[in-house]
Amino acid sequence: MEKVLALVLLTLAVAYAAPDPRGLIINLDNGELCLNSAQCKSQCCQHDSPLGLARCADKARENSGCSPQTIYGIYYLCPCERGLTCDGDKSIIGAITNTNYGICQDPQSKK
């Protein structure tokens, strides 16, 4: 038990001693491998194929392809930037398979 406690304390000491503000698990920059969008500074963890590695990426800009926010936290197309909405077809199957795609639009410019 004492060895386990010493190992945990040593691990914590090494983690806190690292001067780099970039995280190893959270606060990841674009291009770094991720498992969930919560790990990324941009809040988007994107992959190109079901078997591809996911990497942090920028959120979708106006008139770009997008995915609505999902509970999965990994996207084929990133959700829209703040203030934009992802307009597109939505279906139950698309929600399950994470393939509901749309275009980022500014809700203020719609009439």
UniProtKB/Swiss-Prot annotation:
Record keywords, A-Z: Digestion, Disulfide bond, Lipid degradation, Lipid metabolism, Secreted, Signal
The organism of origin for this protein: Myocastor coypus
One Gene Ontology cellular component annotation held by this UniProt entry: extracellular region
SUPFAM superfamilies in alphabetical order: Colipase-like (SSF57190)
Family to which this protein belongs: Belongs to the colipase family.
Protein name, entry field: Colipase
Pfam families assigned to the protein according to its UniProt record, in alphabetical order: Colipase, Colipase_C
Functional description taken from the UniProt entry: Colipase is a cofactor of pancreatic lipase. It allows the lipase to anchor itself to the lipid-water interface. Without colipase the enzyme is washed off by bile salts, which have an inhibitory effect on the lipase.
Keyword Cytoplasm: no
